[in-house]
Amino acid sequence: MTYNIVALPGDGIGPEILNGSLSLLEIISNKYNFNYQIEHHEFGGASIDTFGEPLTEKTLNACKRADAILLGAIGGPKWTDPNNRPEQGLLKLRKSLNLFANIRPTTVVKGASSLSPLKAERVEGTDLVIVRELTSGIYFGEPRYFNNHEALDSLTYTREEIERIVHVAFKLAASRRGKLTSVDKENVLASSKLWRKVVNEVSQLYPEVTVNHLLVDACSMHLITNPKQFDVIVYENLFGDILSDEASVIPGSLGLSPSASFSNDGPRLYEPIHGSAPDIAGKNVANPFGMILSLAMCLRESLNQPDAADELEQHIYNMIEHGQTTADLGGKLNTTDIFEILSQKLNH
């Protein structure tokens, strides 16, 4: 079997961190004996510059045919037209591929706790995964309107939308430490009352998973005071958007956090959570770890290469533990250095 991968370098530092990661993929495929082919397509601001829109039909169709999609980063101050922004291409891609589930791991590895803004003893050993519903909720609810006197956003969830994201979270928890925290605002929101009811019903299908309910404000505090207590956390869209960013600073840098977005069938999208950082683009100083860890997620989830994913992650964690990092993590290496060291480790 030959896996079909679509590469979307995007904007800013996106091309340099993605291209370097693809060089690692070539080494890994030879080492673990699997085949793949790459289609490169412009996306986001780069696509606006070339084609006048952030996501062309050609690129979208290629993504629909793919086994996996790797995205570098998109956006930047260059693209200011509110009706034609790079981010609109990502929203369209998510909707077209029905990418309803967003998965964000947060890990604080041994020796890296000093990077965190929190006390080392509070964060070392943190290993949690956030599951965020991505295509419903207040960002997509209707009706919505805005005028000079009043504005309205609608927070709507159906039973089916809640069930599908909750099943993802339960399955993930069952494969890890067997603990799921469901976050809502059940004390005031009707949508959260339905959310909690559905979670409790679905929990009957997963007796091996222990379920805990937290109100969103309490969860925001517990993420800071005791992040090690969490295994898998599931959120609706708005809560997940906010609190996944809170969780991402626990390791000390956005550059350490990968993510995956997927549907029940079809290709999955893998990308680091950081932005395009146009101020450092082309300077060879970008931290590529988030992109490389996203590649590891792709290896595990879409390319059926769990051993390769484990090896790649362990090499990264070992480098971080020994201070082999870029400047944002306190190290002295540049982007190229990171890829060269990882290439040597993988070839060893």
Swiss-Prot record:
Pfam families: Iso_dh. One of its GO terms (molecular function) is NAD binding. Keywords: Amino-acid biosynthesis, Branched-chain amino acid biosynthesis, Cytoplasm, Leucine biosynthesis, Magnesium, Manganese, Metal-binding, NAD, Oxidoreductase. Pathway: Amino-acid biosynthesis; L-leucine biosynthesis; L-leucine from 3-methyl-2-oxobutanoate: step 3/4. InterPro entries: IsoCit/isopropylmalate_DH_CS, IsoPropMal-DH-like_dom, Isopropylmalate_DH. The record marks Y139, K185 as: Important for catalysis. It is found in: Cytoplasm. Its cofactor is Mg(2+); Mn(2+). Substrate binds at R94, R104, R132, D217. Mg(2+) binds at D217, D241, D245. GO terms for biological process: L-leucine biosynthetic process. PROSITE patterns: IDH_IMDH. Binds 1 Mg(2+) or Mn(2+) ion per subunit. It catalyses: (2R,3S)-3-isopropylmalate + NAD(+) = 4-methyl-2-oxopentanoate + CO2 + NADH. Disulfide bonds: none annotated. Its EC number is 1.1.1.85. Catalyzes the oxidation of 3-carboxy-2-hydroxy-4-methylpentanoate (3-isopropylmalate) to 3-carboxy-4-methyl-2-oxopentanoate. The product decarboxylates to 4-methyl-2 oxopentanoate. Homodimer. HAMAP family: LeuB_type1. Belongs to the isocitrate and isopropylmalate dehydrogenases family. LeuB type 1 subfamily. This is 3-isopropylmalate dehydrogenase. The lineage of its organism: Bacteria, Bacillati, Bacillota, Bacilli, Bacillales.
